[in-house]
Amino acid sequence: MKLKDIYAFCVKEGIKADLRTSKQIESRLQEKKKEYRKLPQGLRRYFDKESLKNPYSDTRILFGDPELDIKSVLIGIDIGVEEVLLADQLSKNGKKIDLVISHHPEGCAYAGLYDVMHLQADLLCNIGIDKDIAESFMKKRIGEVERKIHGANHEKVVDAARLLGVPLMSCHTPADNHAASFMQNLMEKEKPKKVEDILDILEGILGSRFANVTESLNRYGPRILL
């Protein structure tokens, strides 16, 4: 499977699992196209053209030839320079790693993380909140995240991957969409009445699927934080 096909598959499956309507997703893409058309010709080369067809700004091929054939992948929630080095060393020791995939974004995908948060406003609309109120509610939080990550060293991990020749991509919101869709379907099926009922449901799933870590669930399993 080629790198570009893995990337396209992630985006496609993310859209399929998105809790928003197809109309809402298309509307966000149209906003990006309108934004692009308004730019002076000289500035268009700086525009993230991938955002014209991919509604998830936190999911990108960060380094690597899109035509590269991929047979083995190292994937993790967080990928730092150390994991890129691990992939490089594994390849040198005979365990070839063709691609590293990070769930949490790096590079331009991290720099654009705030932009994908507009989907939260769409979801608020879907539960009956007025669009203007939803947009206003999210605007402050989106601005906070944008300012927080603006000065970050976005390219640190990507540069390490480039220097070592390790292909790298991130897949954030598409994966989160599947988690959200799973939870939505689960809650609709189980119909919990109290928050503690939700914990019981989640602990039951974790206990059955990860029996070897059941004793540790009280440390890092589901918890009520508020």
Range-by-range predicted roles:
Residues 1-226:
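Hydrophobic structural segments
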